[in-house]
Amino acid sequence: MVAITVQGAQLIKRVVERFYPGIAFDINEGACYIYKFSDHIRRIRMKHGTKYRRQAEEIMRSISLRKERLYGIPVLDEVEWKYVFDGQTFQSYAFEVYVNSILPWSELDPEEEFLRNYRVSRETTEVEKFIEFRAKNEMQIYGDIPIKVWCCFINELSIELNPIPLGMQVMADFVNRFNSPFHQGNRDLSNLEDFQVAYTTPLLFEMCCMESILEFNIKMRMREEDISALEFGDIKIDPVGLLREFFILCLPHPKKINNVLRAPYSWFVKMWGVGADPIVVLQSTAGDDRNSKDVFYDKFRTEPNRYKALFRSSFYNESRRMNEEKILEAVKYSQNLGSHDRRLPLFEKMLKMVYTTPFYPHKSSNMILASFLLSIQTITGYGRAWVKNVSTEFDKQLKPNPSNLVRDVSDLTREFFKQAYVEAKERREEMVKPEDLYTSMLRLARNTSSGFSTEIYVKKRFGPRLRDKDLVKINSRIKALVIFTKGHTVFTDEELHKKYNSVELYQTKGSRDVPIKATRTIYSINLSVLVPQLIVTLPLNEYFSRVGGITRPDYKKIGGKVIVGDLEATGSRVMDAADCFRNSADRDIFTIAIDYSEYDTHLTRHNFRTGMLQGIREAMAPYRALRYEGYTLEQIIDFGYGEGRVANTLWNGKRRLFKTTFDAYIRLDESERDKGSFKVPKGVLPVSSVDVANRIAVDKGFDTLIAATDGSDLALIDTHLSGENSTLIANSMHNMAIGTLIQRAVGREQPGILTFLSEQYVGDDTLFYTKLHTTDITVFDKVAASIFDTVAKCGHEASPSKTMMTPYSVEKTQTHAKQGCYVPQDRMMIISSERRKDIEDVQGYVRSQVQTMITKVSRGFCHDLAQLILMLKTTFIGAWKMKRTIKENAMYRDRKFDSNDEDGFTLIQIRNPLALYVPIGWNGYGAHPAALNIVMTEEMYVDSIMISKLDEIMAPIRRIVHDIPPCWNETQGDKRGLISATKLSFFSKMARPAVQAALSDPQIMNLVEELPLGEFSPGRISRTMMHSALLKESSAKALLSSGYRLEYQKALNGWIAQVSMRLGEESGVISTSYAKLFDVYFEGELDGAPYMFPDQNLSPQFYIQKMMIGPRVSSRVRNSYVDRIDVILRKDVVMRGFITANTILNVIEKLGTNHSVGDLVTVFTLMNIETRVAEELAEYMTSEKIRFDALKLLKKGIAGDEFTMSLNVATQDFIDTYLAYPYQLTKTEVDAISLYCTQMVMLRAALGLPKKKMKIVVTDDAKKRYKIRLQRFRTHVPKIKVLKKLIDPNRMTVRNLENQFV
């Protein structure tokens, strides 16, 4: 087996050579530079009268002959589409299916959810302009590297792995017959142009790439597990066949067909083998409550299935029949559209035997198949849909009457709301007090749209004739910016009394793309509506996101039953869902999980809103006396939820489109063709109102699209809006009300048949663990009917095909558990992304990609393939960042204006793929080739060179470790370019007393400036907060980043000079100045039986770690220093998004750790941190006297990924088992050491080396160096002392400031 670093580097080298033919890419150099040429700037400047000696055509001819060089660096073109696949052809059937499904534009249904494959014709009609407009939005791939690079990668990989995946065959056939499918920009990946053949080619290519990757992945996984086929029970199944039948069926209309098939595939995995007898489970034991997370896994065992008779009941037959019908529907639809005769033979055969075919969790052939069926669905990418803007259907709403439960469910919702407020108050969570009104608004300062718009001015910093006064106005709707600039106007009479129910005053819908499912609508509710909501619902949000508890139905507190927010998220699925694994292995547990369809739209004023508001009003009664800018809480509730605020509001979304003929349109009166204030999409003509449109609409033979422009197609909505501040909690409370009624009904109609042991509600997900005391089919059918009947009487819909009532199988928030094991579903996209990625910090971004890949591998992706993909991304991400940069004689500079030699040339920097494995501190991305979840720190690098088993893997890395140039990082750029002409008016209301004191007194300000507070010193903090918000606004970002380019050139120029200094005489030898903080000695071997764990579908590199180290036993982590700081910072509502633990650590690193509590409180309050939080922080930081550079170790992100969090590392138990250390170390120092040892233990496990105990000795050298640092830090102490006196709250000026709100 060739080392992955050698094989991968060679593979990516070939990809680069395929993408840029003629490049000389040396695998032993840190980066490779080439130029690209574009004649765009020359054309523009020639219009302005610039004369060039050489014509652009001549330069381009010379480039295509590969003769063009600039300052010794070659100028190259990227490969043309037709050569990407070397002209291979496959005559694949799938390609014909796609071509057959292409429709002419006359077939268009303008409001179809997903665009079908429409032909690109020669003459562009208005209708086609509309299709293209939709395609440019809905076919987006985004992602982080161009799709053509993916195609080169897939081609190279298929040469290595053959046979050739179907996706690649289809692409090769396409470029062979039609040449280029579309054009995509390299710098801006959202730039799609020149569609050829059909408007869906980008989606086709994304699908083909994804299909190929899934084929490679399953082949490589099977090779790792050493199996030749997957198995359904004992029947052999070919996974590639399964994937290909699904892929071909989807081609005619991918997202639509996938959407129909999604449910049957998931349902199949959940129900596979639940009726098999005997049945194999992974036995485990745990605490008393059914939601207990302390689970111990024991062993696999076979037991008789006492439920086997149940599966003949009509509920199960009906359930399977509905899923079979869905498949039939998808097959017929696909066959008609693509005129083919393919079905899903393999899957249909499996579906017939789903209940009784056994699922063997201990056989990887079964486990991989289950996981594979869940991840197949990612091939069609994100569901970017055209969401119709429809009003609430009032006549369909269930009104309260004695025969239904609408009133009961509303009353229960009211009672649960009241109870929630009582429980929250017991935990000291109360509503926002009037004096905290403005400060609390900052909780809403997220980077999402707000429904308001604001103006900000930014300095322009680039151009041939630049004056100082060039300010560019930027309009933004981002919440954070709106709050900073207009926060003081949100809570005024005028805003609070606006009613959003007219054509003049309405609100706007946003949307979120989710993989596979259709687009979700998001209501971006106006800020002046959100603030009153925040005042009353804040205690509930806080209480439920912090509190856990018992989930037994007879237990009166609801805190544990509503699971919201971070409460269960330790960051690792395997830990969070421990209760699912344990319950799915327990023969006594029967699980009921109800799936509501369209939950939000069924939350009407009858069954929900009335009860919710009554509950809130009654809970607010004790606070009658409070006044918010003069308003009572009664009024506040009305401003947050009343008529025209949330109830009965008008929303602007997509226009309603109608088909008509151009003749009919021309014959309209001029007044009827009037343009109102609402814009129509491209290629659509305006008419005055919906009535006019309806009058001339035709169904057949249309040639024109029209839409109303007077707002008569706004949607009137009265149901619950996702986007309200209380969405998740309100949903869960109402859900609990339905759940309670279900329990009552079942208990009344079928007494003693079903005992409810646990209830859990998350939004619209309901999960009951119950005990079933019968296997009588007729009785069971009655119980099922009773449940569906109750749901219907509450005014909701539950679908039998998706609702699960089963033993041995549990699904909770997308985590599937079967027979005690975890069936991971890997739905994380690799190629596409939800939105356009503007990568500001390349290093940070690739690091996060490594984290994503670790999560993918922990969900069954192949470890080697993950590394290859990461190396591909390492090489190309950030390659096209430099604009107008020229490299001349090893110096980087901007190109000259209007220069014959330089205009139109741009430098491209292609990194060495092995930079992935170089430590972050040396400009790499810090992954480790032996196992991705190990972070390659500088220490780890030194240790890895010493391990002989790693010699072959480390050899290629050693050659380039010193040669990686700095990464692009705009966030480090200069923030002074930002002049918000709107000086943060709101900041004065938000700033805390210490900061206000500093801002108002120059003497204090001068002293403060000498402290190392960086971006967070009082003078800069408002600008820092604005800047981080502005970076989310693309128009502003372009202006800010152009200034960063010069700084990046400086960094490159500075870096070249440093190499010789930074390393010893010979490259790769690290000089002695790099000494360790402590010495580690390996002592006796530890032995133990291999561990059992629920996530069996892992690549060997991860599997072996888990087997040797074992799963983490409890969800209680030994909180590291950094986590603890983050927890404390989270209590500061204003600054928590802006200041992170790393910010604090950086300040402390410069200040030193041995200051008194009081001194540190002063420093923190100057960073606008609330006094209470500052005190807690200071106390925590001084309680841990750190005696050497432990902080350096704590900032590397070790053990922070999803997989490592499920291992038994860095816990107290781990420290006791593996470490022997001097008793005088503090907890933080032990933390630092345990992180270092964690990495060593994981590395040794991944390499298959035996487990050993480690002995730690702190070196004298480290103690000496610490003493020297102390001297250096003492210099800051006097300044802080003086400052403390100056901003002492007892001085009059500050006191006046503090009283201004009273």
From Swiss-Prot:
Name of this protein: RNA-directed RNA polymerase
Catalytic activity of the protein: RNA(n) + a ribonucleoside 5'-triphosphate = RNA(n+1) + diphosphate
Gene designation: Segment-1
Broad class of enzyme this protein falls into: transferase
GO molecular function: nucleotide binding; RNA binding; RNA-directed RNA polymerase activity
A Gene Ontology BP annotation from the UniProt entry: viral genome replication
UniProt similarity note: Belongs to the reoviridae RNA-directed RNA polymerase family.
Disulfide-bonded cysteines: none
Annotated EC: 2.7.7.48
Residue span, RdRp catalytic domain: 562-823
Keyword Manganese annotated: no
Swiss-Prot/TrEMBL keywords: Nucleotide-binding, Nucleotidyltransferase, RNA-directed RNA polymerase, Transferase, Viral RNA replication
